[in-house]
A protein has these predicted regions:
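A short, solvent-exposed, low-complexity linear motif enriched for acidic/polar residues
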Residues: 4-236
Length: 236
């Protein structure tokens, strides 16, 4: 008797079907009906990020079943699994569009059962001449306005980030599961005085980026530093 499609697609033993997504979270403005997400005093209209070399770390189900705690377990990588191969590729993720948070799929596929505790990845700089013109030569771009002034915050660095699970026990994968990498705008802009951002070249756009563009080096350094603690992993 021929196998059904469901049988063909069922995960192999010890594996589950998992979808890894990405999104952004922040405060919602309350001053208008069509409110945007806000990062401090910055009203955000769009947020894009490039990723590559992403890998998911987990404590195996075998160790959990043996009574080994998450803290004492050996962290393994899923790079060789179907999901690991998919999410490790270069990605361009749209996290906020027209002021609204988006949920973007990074990848989906089979991955070993266990408790997933963190996701490591590197920001990916879009190449010169890439299709996304606004993201050209950038690895992260946030656009919006501060008190009516058009504002951009961007990075070119291909730096490694670590999204740690919000739960100290990680998230169990044992059956179909959705996990999300979350960029926290409040944490990213904590202690950053965007009211002080300058448009030093008077081109009509306030830019906070590398090489002291527009004279905002201090703000850029703070955001870049905050970013390392502003990304985390959650389940849905």
């Amino acid at each position: 008797m021929a196998c059904s499609n469901d049988d063909d697609e069922a995960p192999k033993e010890g594996y589950s079907q998992v979808t890894l997504k990405a999104t952004a979270e922040g405060e919602s403005e309350t001053s208008s009906e069509n409110s945007r997400l806000a990062a401090g005093v910055m009203s955000v209209s769009s947020f894009s990020v490039g990723t590559q070399d992403m890998e998911m770390k987990y404590v195996s189900q075998a160790e959990i079943d043996a009574g080994i705690s998450i803290g004492d377990g050996l962290l393994e990588t899923n790079l060789s699994a179907e999901l690991g191969t998919e999410v490790s590729q270069e990605k361009s993720l749209q996290l906020i569009v027209d002021g609204e948070s988006q949920v973007t799929v990074i990848g989906e596929g089979q991955t070993p059962n266990g408790h997933y505790t963190e996701v490591l990845f590197t920001l990916h700089q879009h190449a010169e001449g890439s299709a996304g013109s606004e993201m050209e030569n950038k690895s992260l771009l946030i656009e919006g306005d501060v008190e009516g002034k058009s504002t951009q915050v961007w990075l070119a660095a291909e730096k490694q980030l670590r999204a740690v699970a919000a739960s100290s026990q990680g998230y169990e994968v044992k059956g179909d599961t959705d996990l999300s990498v979350v960029f926290d705008l409040e944490a990213m802009f904590e202690g950053v005085d965007m009211d002080a951002a300058l448009d030093a070249n008077s081109d009509g756009v306030v830019e906070v980026g590398p090489d002291n563009i527009d004279g905002n080096a201090a703000l850029y350094s703070q955001i870049e530093s905050n970013l390392e603690g502003a990304v985390w992993l959650k389940n849905q």
